Design a protein with these regions (language model features):
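Long, amphipathic, charge-rich alpha-helical segments that form helical bundles/coiled-coils
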Residues: 169-208
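Positively charged n-region of N-terminal signal peptides that target proteins for export
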Residues: 30-38
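Tryptophan-anchored aromatic micro-motifs
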Residues: 231-254, 334-336
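N-terminal glycine/threonine-rich, aromatic-flanked beta-hairpin/loop signature
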Residues: 250-286
């Protein structure tokens, strides 16, 4: 499938079952939706939210954040959150979560320790996910797990804005506003629309938002650590899977790169380049963040390079036929989600 972009909002498609003037033919749309729905089912079933494993789950490798270990002798072992969680899917836990986050912040001796200790809050509210029996209850549990990291993100931002000098604050504010504007579009790219996913949509949406909000919290914590003169190490991230965008310094996505496992467990990439087109294909992991990409129709080959928190790039090595891409062309995706 090859999609040609005339501009950022007007899309025409060529090579799809002779359906001129349509973005996607009906048959292709049904197949695409079915494939995506099955993939998302595998994604959710792989998460601890269904299995009772909590958020310390056996993640499929789509997640950018690798599992972290807590230092054996860390003082965070002394932190105990107040009150065991009472399971009530009609309860508003907003204030409870805020109090728990505040407790973590006040009892942590460094930002590094604070971010590690946040897992204690997640563990506390994972009992909601473990007790969930219906789709509605699963949706509620996912919302509160996302709220934990959203609360921590807001807490970090409050401290950043009061500590940074004027120029730093202005730069960070612009970046944060762009991230907020981008996250809805990035979520749509990764999980699809509400119409595609039906009653599962809130679960998929909040689970994905939890993941990228946690990642963003680490970014803000790193910036705050710089201001405070603290050492801060970013966690390991996948050298194969992730979502990367080029937003041209705005709140809109111009180009994007998504690398992931599909519902069959095969490695795939979706690459969208501003004013040129979108291609889908498979990749082979060469190690060290280098992925050899081949489009579905074989017309485009290239090398994806993933640089962790610093983004990714795609260099085209071969292009054939009517491909809008040219050999030697390279696209940067500097923002990692």
């Amino acid at each position: 499938m090859l999609i040609n972009f005339n501009d950022r909002h007007a899309i025409t498609v060529s090579g799809m079952n002779n359906c001129p003037g349509k973005a996607i033919c009906e048959g292709d749309l049904v197949l695409f939706t079915m494939k995506k729905t099955i993939y998302l089912l595998v994604l959710v079933l792989s998460m601890g939210i269904f299995t009772g494993c909590g958020k310390e789950n056996t993640e499929i490798e789509n997640s950018r954040m690798e599992q972290q270990t807590t230092p054996e002798n860390s003082e965070n072992d002394e932190i105990h959150l107040d009150d065991e969680l009472k399971i009530d899917f009609t309860c508003d836990y907003s204030e409870d979560i805020k109090k728990d986050v505040d407790d973590i912040v006040s009892h942590s001796t460094s930002l590094q320790e604070e971010l590690t200790n946040m897992e204690k809050v997640t563990q506390k509210y994972t009992s909601l996910a473990e007790a969930a029996q219906t789709q509605g209850e699963m949706n509620v549990a996912a919302h509160w797990l996302y709220t934990i990291w959203d609360t921590e993100l807001n807490n970090l931002w409050s401290r950043l804005s009061s500590s940074a000098d004027r120029q730093t604050k202005e730069n960070l504010l612009a970046e944060q506003r762009n991230w907020i504007d981008l996250k809805e579009e990035v979520t749509l790219l990764n999980i699809g629309s509400r119409e595609e996913n039906g009653s599962m949509y809130p679960l998929l949406q909040d689970s994905y938002l939890e993941e990228i909000t946690k990642n963003r919290a680490y970014v803000l914590a790193r910036e705050l650590a710089k201001i405070k003169g603290e050492d801060f190490a970013m966690p390991e991230v996948s050298a194969k899977y992730g979502t990367f965008v080029d937003n041209q310094g705005t709140g809109d996505i111009y180009s994007s790169l998504i690398t992931r496992q599909n519902w069959e467990g095969k490695d795939e990439a979706v690459i969208s380049v501003y004013r040129q087109g979108e291609i889908e294909g498979s990749f082979v992991d060469n190690g060290n963040g280098e992925l050899s990409f081949t489009s579905e129709d074989g017309s485009v080959k290239g090398m994806i390079k993933i640089d962790g928190w610093n983004g990714a790039s795609f260099k085209i090595t071969e292009a054939y036929g009517e491909s809008p891409f040219s050999a030697g062309e390279e696209v940067e995706f500097p923002l990692a989600f």
